[in-house]
């Protein structure tokens, strides 16, 4: 398994991982599919804060962070996203990606990482708790997908 900074050539594979999750799960509330062009723009704007896991030449997942909120007062706080192909879950890849993302975050002066985890994703909540994130709040019924309202669990880790 190789962890490395995402490159534009990864955009189609990243979009494919995202779109499988968007189309078939409540892990994310979004229903808007990702495009390779949009991913290329994200890679360009995030630089080393967009990490991919490559296994035998194929992407198995990615982790990235982005501004939590606008304004200079939030400059050292980031929200992150980690997504894995279904076959890659439960084998420790998520821990590896997050350890590398946290290393990059510390090097870039990030103080606080946030996760917004779907209440429909208890595995995601457990994963984040296991790597040191603290549940801060549950926002009831703020997401709507697949014809139903869903909760969002906010989790934070001080680096």
Spans of features found by a protein language model:
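Glycine-rich phosphate/pyrophosphate-binding loop shared by adenosine-nucleotide-utilizing enzymes
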Residues: 1, 58-62, 150
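A short beta-loop-alpha structural element at the N-terminal edge
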Residues: 2-16
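Helix-loop element at the rim of GNAT/NAT acetyltransferase active sites that forms part
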Residues: 16-33, 42
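Acetyl-CoA-dependent GNAT
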Residues: 31-87, 98-99, 104, 158-159
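Conserved catalytic-core motifs of GNAT/GCN5-like acyltransferases
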Residues: 64-67, 72, 114-117, 129, ...
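Conserved beta-strand-loop-alpha-helix junction that forms the acyl-donor binding cleft
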Residues: 89, 115-125
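Conserved acetyl-CoA-binding loop-helix of GNAT-fold acetyltransferases
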Residues: 90-103, 126-130
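Conserved GNAT acetyl-CoA-binding A-motif
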Residues: 105-117
């Amino acid at each position: 398994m190789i962890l490395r900074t995402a490159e534009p050539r990864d955009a189609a594979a990243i979009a494919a991982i995202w779109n499988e999750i968007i189309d078939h799960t409540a892990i994310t509330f979004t229903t808007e599919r990702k495009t390779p062009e949009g991913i290329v723009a994200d890679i360009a704007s995030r630089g080393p804060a967009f990490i991919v896991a490559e296994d035998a030449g194929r992407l198995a997942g990615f982790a990235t962070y982005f501004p939590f909120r606008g304004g200079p007062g939030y400059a050292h706080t980031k929200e992150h996203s980690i997504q894995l192909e279904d076959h890659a879950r439960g084998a420790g890849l998520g821990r590896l990606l997050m350890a590398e993302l946290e290393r990059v975050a510390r090097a870039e002066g990030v103080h606080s990482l946030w996760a917004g985890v779907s209440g429909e994703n208890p595995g995601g909540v457990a994963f984040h708790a296991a790597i040191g994130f603290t549940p801060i709040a549950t926002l009831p019924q703020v997401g709507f997908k697949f014809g139903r309202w869903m909760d969002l669990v906010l989790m934070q880790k001080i680096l």
